[in-house]
């Protein structure tokens, strides 16, 4: 009888031994976290600047001028260029907070699944999603507090009279208001609640101006990705769900994360760190997740708030 030499390595099916080996390896857990593409921080999309902190706090400049402190002059041939100073804004300091929790995953929960990895995926996703929700809530509150420019809607997006719904007017006027500041802001993002998002898709004026013969129409996709060249982001974590924000995400601010290289943690692309800890006395695993971060708003003028967009 023919046989292979050397013998092939033994293979493992989706049993408890396989899952245990997976959870004990941070590299494998990290690779698995990359598959959770539907989990994403809204905060990281609105505050795109990134800073690293090692001392538990981050120092940043608020409302930094976008021009130098000297008027540009005509320079004669052969003359030296005049020096100008790069003005700085008001210094701000934010303390890093560690947001985290853990859940218990028993061996019985794993083995009683027809596909044991489902139990691990569900537990990991819930831990990561809970951290996302908390960090997003804190970041959105920070943005909402910092934004001071606001105006009432021209016509609420869910107005009982369809003709009085004016989301496009609100958006275009908001973009104009930011540009009128002449501070270099370029609006690129619209942030709305799920209800406002729905009425944005239902609006007749916007629907009539969109391309008709295309498969990216909201009637097919259930999504509206851009309006007036703004990326539309839907989140239930707005501090006031009846309002909408127009922001310049490149200028608004950022997130400062702290990494301490603690052993056993798998770090995902989301900046969430996850660690699996075996509890032999309980025949279970602790799945522990955390993110050490703080949001900071550098340019309050890079945000514009529209009030009363929905009831």
Pin down the residues of each PLM region.
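Extended, solvent-exposed, turn-rich assembly/linker loops in the middle of proteins
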Residues: 147-220
């Amino acid at each position: 009888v023919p046989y292979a030499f050397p013998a092939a390595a033994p293979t493992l099916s989706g049993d408890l031994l396989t899952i245990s080996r997976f959870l004990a390896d941070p590299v494998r857990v990290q690779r698995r976290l990359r598959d959770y593409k539907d989990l994403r921080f809204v905060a990281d999309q609105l505050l795109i600047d990134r800073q690293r902190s090692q001392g538990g706090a981050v120092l940043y400049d608020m409302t930094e001028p976008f021009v130098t402190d000297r008027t540009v002059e005509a320079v004669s041939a052969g003359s030296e260029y005049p020096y100008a100073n790069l003005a700085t804004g008001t210094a701000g300091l934010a303390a890093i907070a560690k947001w985290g929790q853990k859940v218990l995953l028993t061996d019985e929960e794993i083995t009683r699944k027809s596909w044991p990895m489902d139990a691990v995926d569900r537990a990991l996703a819930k831990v990561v999603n809970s951290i996302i929700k908390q960090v997003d809530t804190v970041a959105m509150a920070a943005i909402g507090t910092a934004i001071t420019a606001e105006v009432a809607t021209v016509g609420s997006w869910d107005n009982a009279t369809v003709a009085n719904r004016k989301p496009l007017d609100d958006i275009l006027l908001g973009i104009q208001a930011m540009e009128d500041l002449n501070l270099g802001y370029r609006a690129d993002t619209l942030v709305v609640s799920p209800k406002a998002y729905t009425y944005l898709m239902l609006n007749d004026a916007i629907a009539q101006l969109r391309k008709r013969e295309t498969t990216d129409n909201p009637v097919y996709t259930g999504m509206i990705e851009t309006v007036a060249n703004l990326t539309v982001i839907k989140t239930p974590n707005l501090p006031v769900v009846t309002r909408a924000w127009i922001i310049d995400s490149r200028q608004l601010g950022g997130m400062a994360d702290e990494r301490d290289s603690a052993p056993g943690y798998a770090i995902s692309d989301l900046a969430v760190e996850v660690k699996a800890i075996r509890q032999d006395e309980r025949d279970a695993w602790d799945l522990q997740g955390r993110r050490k971060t703080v949001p900071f708003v550098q340019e309050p003028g890079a945000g514009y708030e529209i009030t009363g967009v929905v009831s």
